[in-house]
Amino acid sequence: MEQKVILFQGDSITDADRNRTNDLSMGCGYPTLVTGHLGAAFPYQYKFYNRGIGGHRVVDLYARIKADMINLKPDYMSILIGINDVWHEIGGHNGVDAEKFEMVYGWMIEELLRELPDLKLMLLEPFVLPGSATRSNDENPGRWEYFRSETDLRRTVVKRLAEKYDLVFVPLQERFSAANADAPEDGYWLSDGVHPTAAGHELIKQAWLEGFSKL
């Protein structure tokens, strides 16, 4: 039986501390949860790759398009990118503004679809919550508003690109916001407002599988 290839692509949320020297390593996040679910439900039908790399912005992801995407010849692929394009600006003035984010993301999608015309691609929405990495503080009283508003811009871009290229869009912000509405303190779903806990990765897995069912 020829296995279909599923590729998870993104930043640290996808990377989730995977062993980058071991192709079988899915990390400690939603790719492992999805792999376990699909692997048990459909034995031997899929081969899985996780190529998320912590800290990456959309420009870093695009730079890896050949080695970590096209050369793997995926049948199905998900992309979750965007939070570092925001975070790197507030942390080191090295972010990617929303206009350039959309331009580069669009180039990447077009190249993927051109080189892999049968690829089934879904775009996951970036998300953020108040947390230790995102809340305002004395040094940066506008920190949370910046994170929220800039992430919102990139969420809008990802949805617009999914519509433009007729791709599956996987919403995540509302799922996290709703889950967090009654949280007694920060950190239950996203440990620092950006990185998911085990429970947060389960939310992504659920949304991922819903999106996958539409491919």
Sequence positions of predicted segments:
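Serine-esterase "nucleophile elbow" of acetyl-processing enzymes
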Residues: 1-54, 64-73
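Alpha-helical cap/lid subdomain in secreted, periplasmic
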Residues: 2, 33-44, 60-215
